[in-house]
C-alpha cells in the first residue's frame, strides 16, 4: 500500500504537475492571443502542431504495434530466454510467463516512443504549414531544374519525414528483435545465431522498408549537393555534378534493389546472400562518393579549376545575390573631386547640420546622468531617427526612460507588480548640437516631458519596452506610481486596453500558478477590474505572435503625431535551403526584411506590416495567417515617415556584398576586387544613419551608409547606402571610387590624426590632467563629389562617474586635418567663409565668404579667449587660440 502511494506521488510530481502547468500556460497564452486579436494565428499554429504531433505519434504507435503484435503472436519452437533478477539468481520462465512479461513491456516502450515521436513531430508545425501552403517561385535551380519553392517550402519537411520514418523502422526493428530474442525465436550460441523462419521473414520485411528510407536519403543527399560548401564558392561544383550526383542517383535506384536481395536472402535463410548487397552498396558509396571525386578533383579539376568551375561559380554568385537581395543594388561610379568650397558647404547645410557628432556610448552615459531623474529609471539604448523640427528635416537621437526593477529602492511584490508598473517618457535631441559645456541639447527632456521643439508627447507612459521583462497588474486598489516631483509623487491609473482581465477566482488562480506566486490569488488589492499585463518586452511580444519571423534585436521608439509612443521593430523572413547561396554563421542563406511590427508602448497593441511584398516567403506566411499581416500602405502616414532600413540587415548585406559585388566568375575566382568593411581599433565600422543629398538628387534624405575598403588595404573602394524615405525606401546604391587613385579610408585618416603634432599634443595634455579622452566614431560624409571625414572627441573624468563632454571635433578633407571646438569652426578653418551655425539659425553669405566685420569680431573674440586662457595658465589652450587667430588674420589679409 505504501509502495503504491509512493508511486502515485512520483507520478503526480513528474507527470500530472508538469502536464497541468503546460495546460495553464496554454490557456493563458490563448488569453494573450485573444487580447491582441490574433486568435487565428494561435488556432492555425495549434492545429498544425496537433496535426503533425498526432500524425507522427500515431504512425509510430501503429507501425510499432502492428509489428509487435505479429512478434508476440508468432509460433516459435524454442524455449524462452532466461531472465536475470536481483541477487544474481536466474529464473527460467515458461513460455506463457515470458510472453506475459515481454508483451506489456514492448507495448509500454511503443507508447513512450510514440509520445516522444508526437512531440518531435509537433515541433515541425512550421515546416508542415510551409509545405502545404508553398508556392512556385518561378525560378529553377540550374542543376536539378527544380523550382526554388521546392527547396524553400518542401525540402525541410521531406528531410524530417525521411529521418522520422527511418528512425521509426529502426527502433521498431530493435524492439521486434528484442521480443523475438526473449521469446526464444533468436538463439545465440558459440556456433552463431539460430533464427526461426518466422523471425527471418518478419525482419526481412522491415529491412526492405528500411532500404526505401535509405534510398530516399540518397535522393535528398543529391538535392543537398546544391547546398554544400566548397573552397572558393558555395554550392555544387564540377566534381559534385559530374561525379557525386550520378552516383547518388545510382544509389537511389540500387539501394531498394539491394534491400530486396537482402530481404530475400533473409527470408530464405541464405545468409551469404544477405552480406553481398550491403558490401556492394558500401563499396559504391565509398568509391563513388568519396574516392573517385577526390581523384577527379586532384587530377582534373585542380589543374583546370577556373575553366571547369566557371559555370558553377556563376551559379553561386547569382543565387547568393538573390538570397540576400544584392541583385537589386545599383552600382554608380563616384569620381571624387577635391574642389569643395565654402559655397558648397553652405549649399549642403542640411547635410552638415545632421552630421552625427554624438556617439551612442557617450550619449547614453550622458543621458543617464542628466535625465535619469531617479535611480529606478534607466536609459537602455540610444536610437537614431528623423523628425521635422521647426520646419527642418532633422536627425535626432532618442532614448526611452524605462523602469529598472533591479534598481528599485525597496524590492517587494507590491512595488514590483502593482505600484512601479511603467517607465516614463524619453530624451530626444539633435545629433550635432552641443552646449557651451559640451553637453547635448534636448528637444524633449525631463518628467513630465518638456518639449522644446514641435515634437509633443501626450502619452509618456511606457508599459511595454525593452526592459519590461515581467508581468504587472493594473487597475488595482493600489495607485500606480507615475513620476516624482519636488513636492511628492504623482500617481496614475492605467486607462489602456492592454492586458487580460482578472475577473474571476479561476483566472487569478491560473495566473498565480503560471507566475508561481500565490499573491495574485490572495491579494486584496486585486479586484475584478484589474488587468494583468504580460509578454511586455517588445521582442518577446512580437516573437510570441509570429515565432516564424526572426526579429531585429534593436527596436526603436517613435513619437507619433498624436503624441503617443510606438515601438517599431524589423522582422526578417529567412531560410537555410536556397541552392548555391552562401550561408551566414548559423546556416541562413536567404533573408528579407519583409516585416515592420509596431507595438504601442502604452496598451501593447500589435500590428504587423509587409514591407517587402515581393518576398516569396512573406507571401506564403500571409496565406497561412490571412489576418496577421497588413500592407505597408495601411500604416499611418506619420509612422511610415519613421520606418528606416534596418542597421543589422545592411550589415549582413554588406558582409556578402564585399565579395559578391564581383559578378564576373573570373574576377570572383581570383579575388581581384575583394572588399572589406573598414576596421578601426579592433571592431569593424558599423552602418550609420545620416541625412544627406545623394548625388543627382534634388533634396536631402535619411539614409544608412557604410564604406568599403579593398581587401588588406586601407583606402576607400566604395560606399553602400540604403535609402529610407518615402517611395525610395529600400533602394540600395553602391557608389564605387576610381581604382587608379588613392581615396583616403577611415584607418588612413585615423593615422593622420595620430600623426598630427598639435592634435596628439592636446590629447596627451588632456590625459596627463586626468581626463579620459574618448574618440568617437569616424564618419565618412559624401558631399557633392567630395568626402568629409568627421570624428568627435569626448572628455570625461577618469572615474566611472565621469560625464562625457563633447569638447572637440576633428574634420579631415583632402590633405588637411583640423581640430576645433565645433564642427562649424573646423569647416571654417578648412574652407574659409563664415557659414551658418550648425543649428541652422542664420544663413551663410551667398558668395561663401565672411565679411571683414565678421572676421574682425571673430578675431576679437578669439583674442579675448586666448587672454583668459593665458591668465589661467592653460598654455595649450592659449596656443590653440593663437592658431585660430592666425587663420582669421590670414582671411582678413585676403
Curated annotation (Swiss-Prot):
Membrane topology, from the record: Multi-pass membrane protein
Entry GO CC: plasma membrane
Major place of residence: membrane
Domain of life per record: Bacteria
Any matching Pfam family: UPF0182
UniProt cross-references to InterPro entries, sorted A to Z: UPF0182
Subcellular localization, as worded in the UniProt entry: Cell membrane
Keywords annotated in UniProt: Cell membrane, Membrane, Transmembrane, Transmembrane helix
KW ATP-binding (keyword) present: no
Transmembrane segments: 6-26, 50-70, 98-118, 162-182, 203-223, 250-270, 275-295
Family the entry assigns: Belongs to the UPF0182 family.
HAMAP family named in the record: UPF0182
Entry protein name: UPF0182 protein GSU2333
Lineage: Bacteria, Pseudomonadati, Thermodesulfobacteriota, Desulfuromonadia, Geobacterales
